[in-house]
Amino acid sequence: SHGKVETDEEFDARWVTYFS
């Protein structure tokens, strides 16, 4: 994502990738 504000989907997708 670009910029400070992200959607919940972007946030979740990033963490899902980290912890998978």
From Swiss-Prot:
Keyword Heme: yes
Keywords, in A-Z order: Heme, Iron, Membrane, Metal-binding, Mitochondrion, Mitochondrion inner membrane
Gene Ontology molecular function: metal ion binding
Gene Ontology CC entries for this record: mitochondrial inner membrane
Pathway assignment: Energy metabolism; oxidative phosphorylation
Membrane topology: Peripheral membrane protein
Compartments it resides in: Mitochondrion inner membrane
Listed GO biological process terms: oxidative phosphorylation
Functional summary from the UniProt entry: Component of the cytochrome c oxidase, the last enzyme in the mitochondrial electron transport chain which drives oxidative phosphorylation. The respiratory chain contains 3 multisubunit complexes succinate dehydrogenase (complex II, CII), ubiquinol-cytochrome c oxidoreductase (cytochrome b-c1 complex, complex III, CIII) and cytochrome c oxidase (complex IV, CIV), that cooperate to transfer electrons derived from NADH and succinate to molecular oxygen, creating an electrochemical gradient over the inner membrane that drives transmembrane transport and the ATP synthase.
Assembly notes: Component of the cytochrome c oxidase (complex IV, CIV), a multisubunit enzyme composed of 14 subunits. The complex is composed of a catalytic core of 3 subunits MT-CO1, MT-CO2 and MT-CO3, encoded in the mitochondrial DNA, and 11 supernumerary subunits COX4I, COX5A, COX5B, COX6A, COX6B, COX6C, COX7A, COX7B, COX7C, COX8 and NDUFA4, which are encoded in the nuclear genome.
Family listed: Belongs to the cytochrome c oxidase subunit 5A family.
The protein, known as: Cytochrome c oxidase subunit 5A-1, mitochondrial
